[in-house]
């Protein structure tokens, strides 16, 4: 992507080193902002936001383990939140400075955990459509999608980019109203080309293995949320089943800056000028 610089760092997990890839924007001496994507996505989701922030911030957008350009893990059972947190901790140590955190869904969960730790380098936290409580019903929906038998999207092979775009317009309709150009970019960024010329989604299809045969329970992180002593912002898709209205209201009552995005579910794509400007204003406050 023009304006970005690719990079990677080593991190230690389960007795060996892997590499985590990222794209970096802006002046390396500027205040750092770390943007962490959702479960089946990658760091390219933040291109528009990163480009908009790059005049003021150093923006770093990693690919989580098993996604994008980052290495796949030997043991698929390691594709769990605590190991993503560990890898991201290595990235924060590499950055070596106080850092703002923007996290969508899984990226926000990792942000809550890291921001609650003693001595955290995270100084501001933006949560995109995720909060300290996630209902089991929504987690079951995600599990069922991820481990679907037969035509699982994790295993699907696509003949061309048009078929990928049609697939993404269906499964990611909750991202909100996107332009044709935005959908086309999402398709390009979401896939890798296979040796036979077909395309597959740009992640290790085994990322769903920890979910297989598992019946999710409610996730309650209010104790962690209450330990976070930094400025917080929360963005909610108005029809989201991940970030419920009661949770959103309780986060606002605790002092979080709040933005609700109409005609959007899980999760806002952060491509809209209103969303980008709200985040920028929060980071600059």
Task: Cite the ranges covered by each PLM segment.
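Alpha/beta-hydrolase
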Residues: 161-230
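Active-site loop/oxyanion-hole signature of alpha/beta-hydrolase fold enzymes
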Residues: 15-16, 48, 60-103
């Amino acid at each position: 992507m023009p304006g970005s610089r690719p990079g990677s760092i080593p991190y230690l997990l389960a007795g060996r080193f892997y590499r985590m890839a990222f794209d970096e924007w802006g002046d390396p001496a500027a205040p750092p902002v770390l943007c962490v994507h959702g479960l089946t996505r990658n760091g390219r989701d933040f291109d528009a936001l990163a480009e908009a922030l790059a005049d003021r911030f150093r923006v770093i957008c990693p690919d989580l383990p098993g996604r994008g350009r980052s290495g796949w893990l030997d043991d698929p059972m390691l594709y769990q939140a605590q190991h993503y947190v560990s890898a991201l901790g290595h990235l924060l140590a590499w950055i070596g400075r106080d850092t703002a955190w923007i996290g969508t869904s899984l990226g926000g969960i990792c942000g809550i955990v890291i921001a609650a730790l003693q001595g955290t380098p995270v100084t501001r936290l933006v949560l995109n459509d995720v909060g300290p409580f996630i209902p089991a019903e929504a987690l079951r929906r995600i599990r069922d999608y991820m481990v679907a038998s037969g035509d699982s999207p994790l295993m699907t092979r696509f003949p061309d980019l048009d078929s990928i775009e049609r697939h993404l317009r269906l499964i990611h309709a909750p991202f909100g109203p996107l332009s044709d150009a935005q959908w086309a970019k999402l398709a390009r960024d979401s896939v890798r080309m296979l040796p036979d010329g077909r395309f597959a989604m740009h992640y290790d299809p085994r990322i769903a293995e920890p979910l297989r045969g598992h019946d999710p329970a409610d996730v309650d992180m209010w104790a962690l949320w209450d330990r976070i002593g930094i400025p917080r912002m929360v963005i909610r898709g108005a029809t989201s089943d991940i970030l419920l209205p009661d949770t959103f209201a309780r986060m606002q009552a605790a002092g979080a800056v709040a933005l609700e995005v109409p005609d959007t579910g899980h999760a806002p794509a952060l491509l809209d000028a209103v969303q980008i400007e709200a985040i920028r204003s929060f980071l600059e406050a």
